[in-house]
């Protein structure tokens, strides 16, 4: 760069700094290198699929999928993980359907959870913004985008047309919210449903409510839906297998998948999840229905193997460490033992 251009640039930078404060513009090489701060999901398989060890703080995350697919269970499990690490969590219950007893069984400290049941979409999003601006909340869950009804629609007559109202509401709110979340390092999780476009013959007919803004502003989008047969003990169904696909990821390679097991009444089983990941990584060997770790036979069937590991937390941690070593580039957030 010649001298005249260099001086012009320096003058411009000084003027910007004077007007907007120190650090308003800086060279990328001068910025401190920061590791992505994350909140673990409660599933090692999903943490590895995300590539950063959990959901990113200071960003927007969308969890979407068909009904009863495990979306709210996953969001509540993330809240429980944040609380275990001393964080503060909020749940904006636009659907008015939060079950405190179920949340408690998932590990959520319900007495400390901030809950809001807003009357309108505007109120819900304003609450999210104010909580994020406080800088004191680690994760905010909104359940769900489809239930964020604009004030004009609530006050109008049944059958009135309100084309694009919700999409405009989301677009306006997310424009403001993105910068607020980044400054406060708060993770915002939006749970969303799926709808089918009418008249689509080719391609995927599914879409999500709320317009395109959430798809654009979300750093991570997770497609959560049931996969395969229910989990059975004997003839009794005790849970469901759920496939989570990382559809969008601005922080690591996307399109990775994780299969989770959600048990009725208790949610994710982190030890069974670790067994699945360890088998896939070759740390635990599976021969027929028997599971072995080195020379040690853990048991016949996954439930027996998981039970053996619960009784030996030091072995559980050893296996977890080996899985992470095999994973290589993934660094999980520091936290308590997954099996506790």
Swiss-Prot record:
Signal peptide segment: none
Record has Cytoplasm as a keyword: yes
Bridged cysteine pairs (disulfide): none
Localization: Cytoplasm
Biological source species: Thermus thermophilus (strain ATCC BAA-163 / DSM 7039 / HB27)
Protein name according to UniProt: Protein RecA
Keywords on record: ATP-binding, Cytoplasm, DNA damage, DNA recombination, DNA repair, DNA-binding, Nucleotide-binding, SOS response
GO biological process: DNA recombination; DNA repair; SOS response
Transmembrane regions: none
Role description: Can catalyze the hydrolysis of ATP in the presence of single-stranded DNA, the ATP-dependent uptake of single-stranded DNA by duplex DNA, and the ATP-dependent hybridization of homologous single-stranded DNAs. It interacts with LexA causing its activation and leading to its autocatalytic cleavage.
Gene name of this polypeptide: recA
């Amino acid at each position: 760069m010649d001298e005249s251009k260099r001086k012009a640039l320096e003058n411009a930078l000084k003027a910007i700094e004077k007007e907007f404060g120190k650090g308003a513009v800086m060279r990328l090489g001068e910025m401190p290198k920061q590791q992505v701060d994350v909140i673990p999901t409660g599933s090692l398989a999903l943490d590895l699929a995300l590539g950063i060890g959990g959901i990113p703080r200071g960003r927007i995350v969308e969890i979407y999928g068909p009904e009863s697919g495990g979306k709210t269970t996953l969001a509540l499990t993330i809240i429980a993980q944040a609380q275990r690490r001393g964080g503060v969590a909020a749940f904006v219950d636009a659907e008015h359907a939060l079950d405190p007893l179920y949340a408690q069984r998932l590990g959520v400290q319900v007495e400390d959870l901030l809950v809001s049941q807003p009357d309108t979409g505007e109120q819900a999003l304003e609450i999210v913004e104010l909580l994020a601006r406080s800088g004191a909340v680690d994760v905010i869950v909104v359940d769900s985008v489809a239930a964020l009804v604009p004030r004009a629609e609530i006050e109008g007559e049944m059958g009135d047309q309100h084309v694009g109202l919700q999409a405009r509401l989301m677009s306006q709110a997310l424009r403001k919210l993105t910068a607020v979340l980044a400054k406060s390092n708060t993770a915002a999780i939006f749970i969303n449903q799926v709808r089918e476009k009418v008249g689509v013959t080719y391609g995927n007919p599914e879409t999500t409510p709320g317009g395109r803004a959430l798809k654009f502003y979300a750093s991570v989008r997770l497609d959560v839906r049931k996969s395969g047969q229910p989990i059975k003990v004997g003839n009794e169904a005790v849970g469901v297998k759920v496939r989570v696909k990382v559809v969008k990821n601005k922080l690591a390679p996307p399109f990775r998948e994780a299969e989770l097991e959600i048990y009725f009444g208790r949610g994710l089983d982190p030890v069974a999840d670790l067994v699945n990941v360890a088998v896939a990584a070759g740390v635990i060997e599976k021969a027929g229905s028997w599971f072995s770790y080195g020379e040690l036979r853990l048991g016949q069937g996954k439930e027996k193997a998981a039970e053996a590991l619960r009784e030996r937390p030091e072995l559980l941690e050893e296996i977890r460490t080996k899985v992470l070593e095999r994973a290589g580039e993934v660094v999980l957030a520091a936290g308590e033992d997954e099996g506790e």
